[in-house]
Amino acid sequence: MKKSTKLISLLLAVMMIAALLPTAALADNAEPASVGDTIGGVVDTVKGIKIPTYVLYCSLMSKLPASGAVVTLTNNLTGETTTHTANMLGLALIPKSLIGVYTVAATCDGPISGIKYSSLPGATPMTLNAKVDFDKIVLFPVLNIGLNYTDHFAYMIGFPNGNVGPNAKITRAEVAAILYRLMTPKTRANYASTTSPFKDVSASAWYNTEVCTLYKAGLIKGFPDGNFHPNANVTRAEFSAMIARLFSVSYVGNNNFEDTNGHWAQSYINILAKLGILKGDANGNANPNDPLTRAQAAAMCNRLVGRNSTGSSMSSCSGTVKGWPDNANSAWYYADILEATNSHNYTWAVDVKNALGGDFVITEKWTSIRTDAPDWAK
C-alpha cells in the first residue's frame, strides 16, 4: 500500500472513531475571553482527503487536545453563528452544509480549575468549501498579565564571543528580562516602573526597568534582607514561581515529583507540571534547588507561550536563521534555542501520522525571519 493511501486510510479511521466518541461538557460558568492576549490560528493542513464532515482540531498550548472546547463559527457574510463541541480527542465535527467564510472562536476549561483557555478574537478566517476538510485552532490561557502569544520575537540574546551558552546558568536578572520581553506591549506599559523596591537594584542597572516592571506585576519577589540578588543564579523553583504567578490560581493536587514534597515552591511546580510547562528528569524529580540553565529557560518559556518548533520547522528559511556554534543540532534543546533567539513569521502545521492514537501534534513552520523585532541589546 502506498504511503499516501495509508495516511488517507488512517485519517478516515480516526474520523470515524472520533464521530462516535462522547463530547465533554464545558463548565456552566465558562465565558469567552474579553482581552486580546490569546491566540488562535486556523490553517489548511491536509489537502485532497475527502471525509464526511469538516474537522477542526482544537489544541491547548501544551499540545494536549482541548477536549470539550466550544467552537463558535460566525458567517462573515450573514452573521449567523453555529456552535460545535470538540470530543475527547479535541475534534470538532462540522457539517459540510456550512459552506462559506467564517470567523472562528473557541473556549474551554483548562486542566486546573480557574484557568480558562481561549482562541484569539478575530482569528484567521476559516473557509469551508469542497477543497478543505481538516483545520486546526490553538487555545491559550486567558491571563490578567498578558503575554505575547502571536509575535514570535526573539527573547534571548547570545554572548559577545558568538556563543549562546545553552548549558550556562542564568541569573535572576536575566530571567526577569526574558519574562519582560514576552509580555505584550500593552502589559509592559500597564506595569511600567523604574522605582526599585530592592536595595540592590539601582536605577542605572541594565535590568532596572525589567525587574521593577515584573515586581509591580506581582511576578517576582525579593528576599527578607530587602535585596533581589539580581546576579545570583536562579533556581528551577524560583523560575517556576515567577511563571506560575501569571495564572493567579492555587493548585492542590497530587505531587508530581518525588523531590518537591514539602518544598516552598511545591504548588508552583505542580501548576507548571499540570500545564505541561515544567518537565522532570528521568528519575521523576523536578530538581527544584538546581540552578536553571539557559536551555531549560528557553524550553519552559517556549511552552509557556505555545511556541513549538522542531528541527525541521525552520527549513524553509534555513539560510537566514541565526545559528550558534555551541547549539548542536543533535542537542535536545537545539530547536528551543533557535526559537528563543530568532524572530520569525510562521504558520502552524499538524502531524496526523499518529492520529489513530489521538496524537495530533501541532508544530510551527517558519516562513521568514523578521527584521522588525525589538532590539533588546540596546
PLM region spans:
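Feature responds to low-complexity, polar/acidic, surface-exposed segments characteristic
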Residues: 17-30, 43, 127-173, 180-208, ...
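Short, acidic Ser/Thr/Gly-rich low-complexity loop/linker segments typical of extracellular
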Residues: 77-91
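Short strand-edge motifs at loop-to-beta-strand transitions and within beta-strands
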Residues: 92, 124-126
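A short, solvent-exposed loop/turn motif at the edges and junctions
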Residues: 105-123
